[in-house]
Amino acid sequence: MEKPLPNPPIQESLRKQSPQDAVYDDLVFGLKRYEAAFSIKDSIEDVLANFSKDEEKEMVCLSTSIAENPYQSLSLESVPSKILFGSFLFYVKDRIPEKAGYIIEEQFCKRLQQIDYDAYSFSPKECNEKLKNIFSEFSQMKLKMLSVFFSIVQILLPKLSGDYQEHVQFFASISAVVAPRGYVFEIYHAVEHLSLEAREVFQLHHPPSPKQTRRVVSEGPLNGVNYKQNTTNNRVSSFQNSQYSTLNNFQNNSNQSPNSNDLQPLQAEAFHSAHNGYSSSTLNLNSELNVMKDHDLQAPIPRALKQHKLPPIPVPEVQTTNIGYQTDLPLQNPNDNLVSLAIYEALYEKFLKACKDLEEVSKSYEESREEIEALHETFTEEVTSFQSTKRLKEEKIIQEKSRVDKMIDEYRQKLSEST
């Protein structure tokens, strides 16, 4: 069953509203329909993969249906996660701007862009207060719409698989729909911060909180989380085959009405720009992954390079054996050195078992090595982060001491002049 929805506004209250307020109420109720539907989904895996034209039509049709009549008796419980998520993106990107403009308007995009979110990585409360001050200037209905939007994001975040690339692409996707097209890259960090701090900024009360997601995305594997190379390769392969890997050039025209066909290029552009800072017509994924290794958008401190590499281990290969090879030896009596077939088969079985055990030990060693390397990388990052924080605090203390010494000297000088 879907999460319970609030009762639709009664006709008497609708008559007291202005037409625009009634439109806002409908749009907010439509968002709450998505919120209720996502809350019962176990996961949203593969929703960021490419989708066919038929699936796109289904997404657009569903978003239009909800926008036109959000109070209809349409259950979203049975809608596949992929279609539901795509419909949600189209609803926010196309349906809401058609009726009420973008949720985050251009003037507020510029103000959100001016905040240095990396500077508040260790003290998000101060940043949250700045965001609250900006949102206090929103209209009541736009603020409610934004609150429900990030409430949905809070529900979706813990249901991602946890892969770094998937989180970046997810943040890029929602950045591409919540604001005008020309500000997709500019507000990426703002959207990421709001997605992680939404409960504090908008005073949301429902679980879960994705604070652990912040550490996974920003700082790398922790607490035994092990991102293995084969998992990355599988995701790279699926990403290379997706429609997001082909970017379409487009003009940033704020007056142009949104088009449902440009959702995928928007997501890809945001994903591409979020890592490199520039737009390109073709996305080279291998280059992207190299950039990810050297520059982490979410981490406040650059990743430290590891200073050691464990040597690779050989994996034994079991080859077939010629049972009759002893007869080829230049012996006067070959039968003196032959063993019975039963003994040979028993020894050969032991050999195969030993090879299998060695392969298992090698595999276990490989996994342990990856775990150690991940822990070493995490430890190095933590040390670098601590040293940076310590250096900043020491500089602040020195500046404060200089300021106090200066005040003391000025006070002494005034005393001497007065006497």
UniProtKB/Swiss-Prot annotation:
Gene Ontology CC terms: cell division site; medial cortical node; mitotic actomyosin contractile ring; mitotic actomyosin contractile ring, intermediate layer
Matching Pfam families: Nod1 (PF17114)
Gene Ontology terms describing biological process: mitotic cytokinesis, division site positioning
Superkingdom: Eukaryota
InterPro entries per record: Gef2/Nod1_dom
Record-given protein name: Uncharacterized protein C12B10.10
Organism the protein comes from: Schizosaccharomyces pombe (strain 972 / ATCC 24843) (Fission yeast)
